[in-house]
Protein backbone atom coordinates (compact mmCIF):
# COMPACT_ATOMS: atom_id res chain seq x y z
CA UNK A 1 0.00 0.00 0.00
CA UNK A 2 1.29 3.46 -0.87
CA UNK A 3 0.13 4.73 2.49
CA UNK A 4 3.09 2.92 4.01
CA UNK A 5 5.32 5.50 2.33
CA UNK A 6 4.18 8.25 4.66
CA UNK A 7 6.19 7.51 7.79
CA UNK A 8 5.76 9.76 10.83
CA UNK A 9 9.11 11.19 11.91
CA UNK A 10 8.53 9.93 15.44
CA UNK A 11 8.31 6.35 14.18
CA UNK A 12 11.40 6.55 11.99
CA UNK A 13 13.48 8.00 14.81
CA UNK A 14 12.74 4.97 16.99
CA UNK A 15 14.51 2.54 14.67
CA UNK A 16 17.88 1.33 15.85
CA UNK A 17 20.76 3.12 14.16
CA UNK A 18 22.42 0.83 11.65
CA UNK A 19 23.37 2.87 8.61
CA UNK A 20 24.04 1.99 5.01
CA UNK A 21 22.39 -1.43 4.69
CA UNK A 22 20.63 -2.20 1.37
CA UNK A 23 16.88 -2.57 1.61
CA UNK A 24 14.83 -5.64 0.88
CA UNK A 25 13.57 -5.68 -2.72
CA UNK A 26 11.49 -2.62 -3.63
CA UNK A 27 8.53 -3.53 -5.82
CA UNK A 28 6.95 -0.13 -6.36
CA UNK A 29 7.63 2.11 -9.36
CA UNK A 30 8.14 5.81 -8.55
CA UNK A 31 5.03 7.92 -9.05
CA UNK A 32 6.55 11.39 -9.33
CA UNK A 33 4.56 14.45 -10.36
CA UNK A 34 5.69 16.13 -12.47
CA UNK A 35 7.08 13.30 -14.57
CA UNK A 36 10.84 13.67 -15.06
CA UNK A 37 12.38 14.19 -18.47
CA UNK A 38 14.29 10.90 -18.15
CA UNK A 39 13.71 8.22 -15.52
CA UNK A 40 14.96 4.66 -15.14
CA UNK A 41 13.89 2.68 -12.08
CA UNK A 42 14.84 -0.90 -11.24
CA UNK A 43 12.10 -2.54 -9.19
CA UNK A 44 12.18 -6.01 -7.69
CA UNK A 45 15.75 -5.48 -6.49
CA UNK A 46 17.35 -4.16 -3.35
CA UNK A 47 17.26 -0.40 -3.06
CA UNK A 48 18.51 2.17 -0.57
CA UNK A 49 17.12 1.53 2.90
CA UNK A 50 15.61 4.46 4.78
CA UNK A 51 14.76 2.36 7.82
CA UNK A 52 17.31 4.21 9.92
CA UNK A 53 17.31 7.46 7.97
CA UNK A 54 19.95 9.24 5.90
CA UNK A 55 23.45 10.49 6.76
CA UNK A 56 24.09 13.96 5.34
CA UNK A 57 27.49 15.64 4.78
CA UNK A 58 27.96 18.14 7.58
CA UNK A 59 30.08 20.57 5.58
CA UNK A 60 27.69 20.94 2.63
CA UNK A 61 25.16 23.81 2.95
CA UNK A 62 22.66 21.80 0.89
CA UNK A 63 22.42 19.36 3.78
CA UNK A 64 20.34 21.89 5.72
CA UNK A 65 17.76 21.85 2.94
CA UNK A 66 17.94 18.07 2.67
CA UNK A 67 17.46 17.79 6.43
CA UNK A 68 14.30 19.91 6.21
CA UNK A 69 12.81 18.02 3.26
CA UNK A 70 13.53 14.57 4.69
CA UNK A 71 12.21 15.58 8.10
CA UNK A 72 9.00 16.96 6.57
CA UNK A 73 8.50 13.57 4.93
CA UNK A 74 9.08 11.55 8.09
CA UNK A 75 12.66 10.46 7.33
CA UNK A 76 15.29 10.70 10.03
CA UNK A 77 18.62 12.40 9.25
CA UNK A 78 21.98 12.90 10.90
CA UNK A 79 24.86 15.18 9.92
CA UNK A 80 28.23 13.43 9.63
CA UNK A 81 31.79 14.51 8.82
CA UNK A 82 32.41 11.48 6.60
CA UNK A 83 30.65 8.40 5.27
CA UNK A 84 27.61 10.41 4.21
CA UNK A 85 24.90 8.60 2.25
CA UNK A 86 24.26 11.55 -0.08
CA UNK A 87 26.88 13.06 -2.35
CA UNK A 88 26.13 16.56 -3.69
CA UNK A 89 28.04 17.81 -6.74
CA UNK A 90 27.77 20.89 -8.93
CA UNK A 91 27.36 20.58 -12.70
CA UNK A 92 26.78 23.87 -14.52
CA UNK A 93 25.80 22.01 -17.71
CA UNK A 94 22.51 21.05 -16.03
CA UNK A 95 21.37 24.69 -15.97
CA UNK A 96 19.78 26.61 -13.13
CA UNK A 97 16.94 24.15 -12.50
CA UNK A 98 18.22 20.86 -13.89
CA UNK A 99 19.47 17.95 -11.84
CA UNK A 100 20.80 14.42 -12.08
CA UNK A 101 19.86 11.83 -9.46
CA UNK A 102 21.22 8.32 -8.91
CA UNK A 103 20.18 5.89 -6.18
CA UNK A 104 21.99 2.60 -5.49
CA UNK A 105 21.70 0.30 -2.48
CA UNK A 106 24.74 2.05 -0.98
CA UNK A 107 24.41 5.75 -1.83
CA UNK A 108 22.48 8.66 -3.29
CA UNK A 109 24.13 11.06 -5.75
CA UNK A 110 22.69 14.47 -6.63
CA UNK A 111 24.24 16.73 -9.25
CA UNK A 112 22.76 20.15 -9.98
CA UNK A 113 23.61 23.49 -11.48
CA UNK A 114 22.20 25.46 -8.55
CA UNK A 115 20.50 25.16 -5.18
CA UNK A 116 17.13 25.08 -6.94
CA UNK A 117 18.13 22.05 -8.99
CA UNK A 118 19.20 20.26 -5.82
CA UNK A 119 15.84 21.09 -4.20
CA UNK A 120 14.00 19.52 -7.14
CA UNK A 121 16.19 16.43 -6.93
CA UNK A 122 15.35 16.09 -3.24
CA UNK A 123 11.64 16.45 -3.96
CA UNK A 124 11.89 13.73 -6.62
CA UNK A 125 13.70 11.61 -4.06
CA UNK A 126 11.04 11.86 -1.36
CA UNK A 127 8.29 11.26 -3.93
CA UNK A 128 10.04 7.97 -4.74
CA UNK A 129 9.96 6.59 -1.20
CA UNK A 130 8.22 3.20 -1.13
CA UNK A 131 7.80 0.26 1.19
CA UNK A 132 10.22 -2.59 0.56
CA UNK A 133 9.17 -6.22 0.80
CA UNK A 134 9.50 -6.07 4.59
CA UNK A 135 7.31 -2.98 4.82
CA UNK A 136 10.20 -0.67 5.66
CA UNK A 137 10.80 2.68 3.90
CA UNK A 138 13.24 2.52 1.00
CA UNK A 139 14.19 4.04 -2.32
CA UNK A 140 14.29 1.94 -5.48
CA UNK A 141 17.39 2.00 -7.65
CA UNK A 142 16.98 5.14 -9.72
CA UNK A 143 18.62 7.12 -12.47
CA UNK A 144 16.99 10.47 -13.24
CA UNK A 145 18.13 13.31 -15.47
CA UNK A 146 15.66 16.12 -15.42
CA UNK A 147 15.08 19.76 -16.16
CA UNK A 148 11.89 21.82 -16.64
CA UNK A 149 10.33 22.59 -19.99
CA UNK A 150 9.40 26.12 -18.84
CA UNK A 151 11.12 28.57 -16.50
CA UNK A 152 7.88 30.09 -15.16
CA UNK A 153 5.70 27.61 -13.26
CA UNK A 154 3.36 29.63 -11.15
CA UNK A 155 0.30 30.07 -9.00
CA UNK A 156 -1.36 33.44 -8.37
CA UNK A 157 -2.78 34.20 -4.92
CA UNK A 158 -5.38 36.97 -4.58
CA UNK A 159 -5.25 38.46 -1.07
CA UNK A 160 -7.48 41.44 -1.88
CA UNK A 161 -10.92 39.85 -1.85
CA UNK A 162 -9.96 37.46 0.96
CA UNK A 163 -6.58 37.23 2.63
CA UNK A 164 -4.99 34.26 4.33
CA UNK A 165 -2.72 34.32 7.37
CA UNK A 166 0.99 33.71 6.87
CA UNK A 167 0.76 30.18 8.32
CA UNK A 168 -1.61 29.21 5.48
CA UNK A 169 0.58 30.83 2.84
CA UNK A 170 3.48 28.75 4.14
CA UNK A 171 1.44 25.58 3.69
CA UNK A 172 0.74 26.63 0.09
CA UNK A 173 4.46 27.24 -0.48
CA UNK A 174 5.31 23.80 0.92
CA UNK A 175 2.92 22.18 -1.55
CA UNK A 176 4.28 24.29 -4.39
CA UNK A 177 7.80 23.14 -3.60
CA UNK A 178 6.80 19.47 -3.70
CA UNK A 179 5.41 19.84 -7.21
CA UNK A 180 8.26 22.05 -8.46
CA UNK A 181 6.42 25.35 -8.88
CA UNK A 182 8.85 28.25 -8.75
CA UNK A 183 6.70 31.41 -8.84
CA UNK A 184 4.09 32.79 -6.46
CA UNK A 185 2.38 35.81 -8.02
CA UNK A 186 0.92 37.76 -5.09
CA UNK A 187 -2.06 40.00 -5.94
CA UNK A 188 -1.99 42.57 -3.13
CA UNK A 189 -4.06 45.58 -4.25
CA UNK A 190 -7.49 45.86 -5.85
CA UNK A 191 -10.88 47.57 -5.60
CA UNK A 192 -11.91 45.54 -2.56
CA UNK A 193 -8.81 45.99 -0.45
CA UNK A 194 -5.17 47.14 -0.25
CA UNK A 195 -3.10 44.57 1.70
CA UNK A 196 0.40 45.93 1.07
CA UNK A 197 2.11 48.03 3.80
CA UNK A 198 3.52 51.30 2.46
CA UNK A 199 5.09 53.30 5.28
CA UNK A 200 4.88 56.63 3.45
CA UNK A 201 1.14 56.21 2.84
CA UNK A 202 -0.40 54.57 5.94
CA UNK A 203 -3.99 55.25 4.86
CA UNK A 204 -3.56 52.69 2.08
CA UNK A 205 -3.99 49.97 4.70
CA UNK A 206 -5.95 51.75 7.44
CA UNK A 207 -8.57 53.04 4.98
CA UNK A 208 -7.90 51.12 1.77
CA UNK A 209 -7.59 47.83 3.62
CA UNK A 210 -11.13 47.94 5.03
CA UNK A 211 -14.46 47.43 3.26
CA UNK A 212 -17.82 47.89 4.92
CA UNK A 213 -19.14 44.48 3.90
CA UNK A 214 -18.84 41.66 1.37
CA UNK A 215 -21.36 39.71 -0.69
CA UNK A 216 -22.94 36.85 1.24
CA UNK A 217 -21.29 33.50 0.55
CA UNK A 218 -23.88 31.66 -1.51
CA UNK A 219 -25.76 34.86 -2.49
CA UNK A 220 -23.63 37.27 -4.48
CA UNK A 221 -26.45 39.84 -4.73
CA UNK A 222 -26.73 40.44 -0.99
CA UNK A 223 -24.29 42.11 1.39
CA UNK A 224 -23.43 40.43 4.67
CA UNK A 225 -23.25 43.67 6.67
CA UNK A 226 -19.96 42.61 8.29
CA UNK A 227 -16.83 44.77 7.89
CA UNK A 228 -13.80 43.02 6.40
CA UNK A 229 -10.33 44.45 6.87
CA UNK A 230 -6.69 43.53 7.17
CA UNK A 231 -3.24 43.83 5.68
CA UNK A 232 0.16 42.18 5.94
CA UNK A 233 2.92 43.82 7.93
CA UNK A 234 6.32 44.42 6.38
CA UNK A 235 7.76 41.71 8.62
CA UNK A 236 5.11 39.23 7.49
CA UNK A 237 5.87 39.93 3.84
CA UNK A 238 9.60 39.51 4.45
CA UNK A 239 8.86 36.24 6.22
CA UNK A 240 6.84 34.94 3.26
CA UNK A 241 9.53 36.03 0.78
CA UNK A 242 12.27 34.32 2.83
CA UNK A 243 10.25 31.15 3.33
CA UNK A 244 9.50 30.99 -0.40
CA UNK A 245 13.14 31.58 -1.35
CA UNK A 246 14.24 28.69 0.86
CA UNK A 247 11.92 26.51 -1.25
CA UNK A 248 13.12 27.74 -4.63
CA UNK A 249 10.11 30.02 -5.13
CA UNK A 250 10.20 33.67 -6.21
CA UNK A 251 7.38 35.92 -4.99
CA UNK A 252 6.22 38.42 -7.63
CA UNK A 253 4.23 41.35 -6.15
CA UNK A 254 1.31 42.93 -8.01
CA UNK A 255 0.17 46.53 -7.54
CA UNK A 256 -2.85 47.19 -9.76
CA UNK A 257 -2.90 50.27 -12.02
CA UNK A 258 -4.39 52.28 -13.60
CA UNK A 259 -7.67 50.43 -12.93
CA UNK A 260 -8.76 48.27 -9.99
CA UNK A 261 -7.64 51.26 -7.91
CA UNK A 262 -10.73 51.99 -5.78
CA UNK A 263 -9.06 51.11 -2.47
CA UNK A 264 -6.04 53.33 -3.10
CA UNK A 265 -8.20 56.23 -4.27
CA UNK A 266 -10.53 55.83 -1.27
CA UNK A 267 -7.46 56.24 0.95
CA UNK A 268 -6.05 59.19 -1.02
CA UNK A 269 -8.87 60.74 -3.11
CA UNK A 270 -6.50 63.22 -4.78
CA UNK A 271 -5.05 60.30 -6.79
CA UNK A 272 -8.29 59.86 -8.73
CA UNK A 273 -10.10 61.87 -11.38
CA UNK A 274 -11.45 64.45 -8.96
CA UNK A 275 -12.90 66.69 -11.67
CA UNK A 276 -15.66 64.33 -12.82
CA UNK A 277 -19.32 64.59 -11.77
CA UNK A 278 -20.36 62.51 -8.75
CA UNK A 279 -16.82 61.73 -7.62
CA UNK A 280 -17.16 59.61 -4.45
CA UNK A 281 -14.48 56.92 -4.14
CA UNK A 282 -14.78 54.08 -1.64
CA UNK A 283 -13.41 50.61 -1.03
CA UNK A 284 -15.76 48.46 -3.06
CA UNK A 285 -18.19 46.09 -1.33
CA UNK A 286 -19.12 44.06 -4.41
CA UNK A 287 -17.07 42.02 -6.85
CA UNK A 288 -16.51 42.78 -10.51
CA UNK A 289 -15.03 45.77 -12.35
CA UNK A 290 -15.43 49.29 -10.94
CA UNK A 291 -14.88 52.65 -12.67
CA UNK A 292 -12.28 54.28 -10.42
CA UNK A 293 -8.91 54.68 -12.14
CA UNK A 294 -5.80 56.60 -11.19
CA UNK A 295 -5.63 60.08 -12.69
CA UNK A 296 -2.76 60.49 -15.20
CA UNK A 297 -1.16 63.31 -13.21
CA UNK A 298 2.31 64.04 -11.87
CA UNK A 299 0.95 63.63 -8.34
CA UNK A 300 -0.12 60.08 -9.19
CA UNK A 301 3.24 59.21 -10.74
CA UNK A 302 5.10 60.53 -7.68
CA UNK A 303 2.84 58.40 -5.49
CA UNK A 304 3.47 55.31 -7.61
CA UNK A 305 7.21 55.95 -7.58
CA UNK A 306 7.15 56.01 -3.78
CA UNK A 307 5.08 52.81 -3.69
CA UNK A 308 7.39 51.04 -6.14
CA UNK A 309 10.44 51.99 -4.05
CA UNK A 310 8.93 50.34 -0.98
CA UNK A 311 7.76 47.32 -2.97
CA UNK A 312 11.28 46.81 -4.33
CA UNK A 313 12.61 46.85 -0.77
CA UNK A 314 10.04 44.28 0.39
CA UNK A 315 10.60 41.97 -2.59
CA UNK A 316 14.32 42.31 -3.33
CA UNK A 317 14.62 39.00 -5.19
CA UNK A 318 11.73 39.53 -7.59
CA UNK A 319 12.96 40.43 -11.07
CA UNK A 320 9.49 41.82 -11.87
CA UNK A 321 6.89 44.24 -10.58
CA UNK A 322 3.42 43.26 -11.80
CA UNK A 323 1.31 46.36 -12.51
CA UNK A 324 -1.97 44.66 -13.41
CA UNK A 325 -3.15 46.86 -16.27
CA UNK A 326 -6.32 44.84 -16.81
CA UNK A 327 -9.96 45.85 -16.89
CA UNK A 328 -9.26 49.59 -16.66
CA UNK A 329 -12.51 51.37 -17.59
CA UNK A 330 -11.95 54.53 -19.59
CA UNK A 331 -15.20 56.28 -18.58
CA UNK A 332 -13.64 58.55 -15.96
CA UNK A 333 -10.80 59.55 -18.25
CA UNK A 334 -13.34 60.43 -20.93
CA UNK A 335 -15.23 62.62 -18.44
CA UNK A 336 -12.17 64.23 -16.86
CA UNK A 337 -11.02 67.55 -18.37
CA UNK A 338 -7.59 66.98 -16.81
CA UNK A 339 -7.23 63.54 -18.39
CA UNK A 340 -8.30 64.90 -21.76
CA UNK A 341 -5.75 67.68 -21.43
CA UNK A 342 -3.07 65.09 -20.65
CA UNK A 343 -3.98 63.33 -23.90
CA UNK A 344 -3.62 66.56 -25.88
CA UNK A 345 -0.35 67.49 -24.16
CA UNK A 346 1.18 64.13 -25.06
CA UNK A 347 -0.28 63.73 -28.55
CA UNK A 348 -2.43 60.74 -27.64
CA UNK A 349 -5.29 59.79 -29.94
CA UNK A 350 -7.55 58.01 -27.44
CA UNK A 351 -7.85 56.66 -23.92
CA UNK A 352 -6.20 53.36 -24.87
CA UNK A 353 -3.10 55.30 -25.84
CA UNK A 354 -3.40 57.20 -22.56
CA UNK A 355 -3.25 53.88 -20.72
CA UNK A 356 -0.12 52.91 -22.67
CA UNK A 357 1.40 56.30 -21.84
CA UNK A 358 0.57 55.71 -18.18
CA UNK A 359 2.15 52.25 -18.21
CA UNK A 360 5.29 53.45 -20.00
CA UNK A 361 5.77 56.16 -17.38
CA UNK A 362 5.53 53.53 -14.66
CA UNK A 363 7.81 51.15 -16.56
CA UNK A 364 10.58 53.76 -16.57
CA UNK A 365 10.36 53.91 -12.79
CA UNK A 366 10.42 50.12 -12.50
CA UNK A 367 13.33 49.72 -14.93
CA UNK A 368 15.35 52.40 -13.12
CA UNK A 369 15.13 50.21 -9.99
CA UNK A 370 16.57 47.21 -11.81
CA UNK A 371 13.23 45.46 -12.24
CA UNK A 372 11.08 44.56 -15.23
CA UNK A 373 7.42 45.34 -15.80
CA UNK A 374 4.91 42.55 -16.23
CA UNK A 375 1.16 42.99 -16.69
CA UNK A 376 -2.05 41.39 -17.91
CA UNK A 377 -2.63 41.32 -21.65
CA UNK A 378 -4.63 44.58 -21.71
CA UNK A 379 -1.29 46.40 -21.46
CA UNK A 380 -1.02 45.64 -25.17
CA UNK A 381 -3.95 47.92 -26.01
CA UNK A 382 -2.69 51.26 -27.25
CA UNK A 383 0.80 49.89 -27.86
CA UNK A 384 3.00 47.47 -25.92
CA UNK A 385 6.40 48.48 -24.60
CA UNK A 386 9.11 46.36 -26.27
CA UNK A 387 10.59 45.40 -22.89
CA UNK A 388 7.38 44.50 -21.05
CA UNK A 389 6.37 40.93 -20.25
CA UNK A 390 2.73 40.08 -20.82
CA UNK A 391 0.46 37.62 -19.00
CA UNK A 392 -2.07 36.27 -21.48
CA UNK A 393 -5.36 35.57 -19.67
CA UNK A 394 -8.15 36.35 -22.17
CA UNK A 395 -8.63 33.11 -24.07
CA UNK A 396 -11.20 34.82 -26.28
CA UNK A 397 -8.40 37.04 -27.64
CA UNK A 398 -6.25 34.33 -29.31
CA UNK A 399 -4.14 36.79 -31.27
CA UNK A 400 -2.87 38.77 -28.27
CA UNK A 401 -0.08 36.28 -27.50
CA UNK A 402 0.88 36.00 -31.15
CA UNK A 403 1.16 39.78 -31.54
CA UNK A 404 3.30 40.08 -28.41
CA UNK A 405 5.61 37.28 -29.55
CA UNK A 406 5.96 38.85 -33.00
CA UNK A 407 7.06 42.10 -31.33
CA UNK A 408 9.69 40.22 -29.34
CA UNK A 409 7.96 40.37 -25.96
CA UNK A 410 8.05 37.53 -23.45
CA UNK A 411 4.70 36.06 -22.41
CA UNK A 412 3.36 33.94 -19.56
CA UNK A 413 0.28 31.92 -20.45
CA UNK A 414 -2.58 32.11 -17.92
CA UNK A 415 -5.65 31.48 -20.14
CA UNK A 416 -8.94 31.60 -18.26
CA UNK A 417 -10.14 28.69 -20.41
CA UNK A 418 -7.66 26.36 -18.69
CA UNK A 419 -6.00 28.06 -15.73
CA UNK A 420 -8.59 30.03 -13.77
CA UNK A 421 -8.81 27.77 -10.76
CA UNK A 422 -11.61 29.83 -9.20
CA UNK A 423 -13.83 28.30 -11.91
CA UNK A 424 -15.93 25.25 -11.14
CA UNK A 425 -14.08 21.93 -11.46
CA UNK A 426 -16.90 19.89 -12.96
CA UNK A 427 -20.44 18.72 -12.46
CA UNK A 428 -19.69 16.75 -9.29
CA UNK A 429 -19.37 19.12 -6.37
CA UNK A 430 -20.87 19.62 -2.91
CA UNK A 431 -24.33 21.19 -2.88
CA UNK A 432 -23.48 23.43 0.09
CA UNK A 433 -23.59 27.16 -0.79
CA UNK A 434 -20.08 27.73 0.56
CA UNK A 435 -18.75 25.73 -2.40
CA UNK A 436 -20.18 28.28 -4.83
CA UNK A 437 -17.79 29.34 -7.61
CA UNK A 438 -17.53 32.52 -9.64
CA UNK A 439 -19.17 30.75 -12.59
CA UNK A 440 -20.21 27.29 -13.68
CA UNK A 441 -17.54 26.79 -16.33
CA UNK A 442 -16.45 23.18 -15.95
CA UNK A 443 -12.66 23.24 -15.83
CA UNK A 444 -11.55 19.74 -14.87
CA UNK A 445 -8.03 18.53 -14.13
CA UNK A 446 -8.18 16.74 -17.49
CA UNK A 447 -8.84 20.09 -19.17
CA UNK A 448 -5.84 21.59 -17.40
CA UNK A 449 -3.65 18.63 -18.38
CA UNK A 450 -4.60 19.13 -22.02
CA UNK A 451 -3.20 22.67 -22.15
CA UNK A 452 -0.35 23.34 -24.57
CA UNK A 453 1.21 26.63 -23.40
CA UNK A 454 2.95 27.49 -26.68
CA UNK A 455 0.30 29.06 -28.93
CA UNK A 456 -0.41 27.14 -32.09
CA UNK A 457 1.60 28.39 -35.04
CA UNK A 458 4.37 29.98 -32.95
CA UNK A 459 7.61 29.94 -34.97
CA UNK A 460 10.28 27.78 -33.35
CA UNK A 461 12.57 30.78 -32.86
CA UNK A 462 9.83 32.50 -30.83
CA UNK A 463 9.02 29.58 -28.52
CA UNK A 464 11.66 30.62 -25.98
CA UNK A 465 9.67 33.83 -25.42
CA UNK A 466 6.90 31.72 -23.86
CA UNK A 467 8.31 31.72 -20.34
CA UNK A 468 5.73 29.30 -19.01
CA UNK A 469 2.30 29.17 -17.45
CA UNK A 470 0.46 30.02 -14.27
CA UNK A 471 -2.89 29.28 -12.63
CA UNK A 472 -4.84 32.23 -11.23
CA UNK A 473 -6.90 31.79 -8.08
CA UNK A 474 -9.18 34.80 -7.63
CA UNK A 475 -10.75 34.73 -4.18
CA UNK A 476 -14.16 36.35 -4.45
CA UNK A 477 -15.66 32.98 -3.51
CA UNK A 478 -12.61 31.55 -1.73
CA UNK A 479 -12.70 32.94 1.83
CA UNK A 480 -10.10 30.68 3.45
CA UNK A 481 -7.54 27.91 2.97
CA UNK A 482 -9.89 24.88 2.89
CA UNK A 483 -11.84 26.39 -0.02
CA UNK A 484 -8.59 27.47 -1.72
CA UNK A 485 -7.28 23.91 -1.50
CA UNK A 486 -10.54 22.51 -2.86
CA UNK A 487 -10.31 24.79 -5.89
CA UNK A 488 -6.61 24.26 -6.53
CA UNK A 489 -6.06 20.53 -5.97
CA UNK A 490 -5.76 18.24 -7.87
CA UNK A 491 -5.71 20.72 -10.77
CA UNK A 492 -2.37 22.14 -9.61
CA UNK A 493 -0.76 18.73 -10.06
CA UNK A 494 -1.93 18.65 -13.67
CA UNK A 495 -0.49 22.13 -14.22
CA UNK A 496 2.79 21.11 -12.58
CA UNK A 497 3.25 18.45 -15.24
CA UNK A 498 2.19 20.76 -18.08
CA UNK A 499 4.81 23.29 -16.99
CA UNK A 500 7.66 20.86 -16.31
CA UNK A 501 7.43 17.70 -18.40
CA UNK A 502 8.45 17.52 -22.08
CA UNK A 503 5.35 17.64 -24.24
CA UNK A 504 6.06 14.29 -25.86
CA UNK A 505 6.10 12.52 -22.46
CA UNK A 506 2.70 13.73 -21.31
CA UNK A 507 0.15 10.91 -21.00
CA UNK A 508 -3.18 11.49 -19.27
CA UNK A 509 -3.80 7.84 -18.39
CA UNK A 510 -0.36 7.47 -16.82
CA UNK A 511 -0.78 10.80 -15.02
CA UNK A 512 -4.07 9.63 -13.48
CA UNK A 513 -2.32 6.58 -12.01
CA UNK A 514 0.37 8.76 -10.50
CA UNK A 515 -2.24 11.27 -9.30
CA UNK A 516 -4.03 8.54 -7.35
CA UNK A 517 -0.71 7.64 -5.71
CA UNK A 518 -0.27 11.26 -4.56
CA UNK A 519 -3.60 11.42 -2.73
CA UNK A 520 -2.36 9.72 0.48
CA UNK A 521 0.28 12.43 0.77
CA UNK A 522 -2.36 15.15 0.40
CA UNK A 523 -4.52 13.37 2.96
CA UNK A 524 -1.61 13.17 5.39
CA UNK A 525 -1.03 16.92 5.00
CA UNK A 526 -4.71 17.69 5.60
CA UNK A 527 -5.25 19.18 2.14
CA UNK A 528 -8.94 19.68 1.36
CA UNK A 529 -8.61 18.66 -2.31
CA UNK A 530 -11.49 17.74 -4.59
CA UNK A 531 -11.63 13.95 -4.78
CA UNK A 532 -11.20 12.96 -8.44
CA UNK A 533 -13.71 10.11 -8.19
CA UNK A 534 -16.76 11.79 -6.66
CA UNK A 535 -16.01 15.51 -6.30
CA UNK A 536 -16.33 15.45 -2.51
CA UNK A 537 -13.97 17.52 -0.36
CA UNK A 538 -11.18 15.42 1.10
CA UNK A 539 -11.68 17.11 4.49
CA UNK A 540 -15.50 17.18 4.81
CA UNK A 541 -15.29 18.65 8.30
CA UNK A 542 -13.44 21.73 6.99
CA UNK A 543 -15.24 25.01 7.68
CA UNK A 544 -15.60 27.38 4.72
CA UNK A 545 -16.00 30.85 6.21
CA UNK A 546 -14.41 34.27 6.26
CA UNK A 547 -11.62 34.76 8.75
CA UNK A 548 -11.75 38.20 10.31
CA UNK A 549 -8.57 40.26 10.36
Model-derived features: where do they sit?
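Flexible loop/turn segments at secondary-structure boundaries
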Residues: 163-165, 191-197, 258-264, 328-333, ...
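Feature activates predominantly on carbohydrate-active enzymes
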Residues: 94-320, 361, 365, 470-475
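Bacterial N-terminal signal peptides that target proteins for export
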Residues: 1-7
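Acidic, contiguous N-terminal accessory segments
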Residues: 20-151, 367-376, 380, 517-525, ...
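Active-site neighborhood of glycoside hydrolase catalytic domains
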Residues: 266-270, 282-388, 394-403
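Flexible, acidic glycine-rich loops studded with aromatic residues
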Residues: 372-388, 394-549
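Bacterial N-terminal signal peptides
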Residues: 8-17
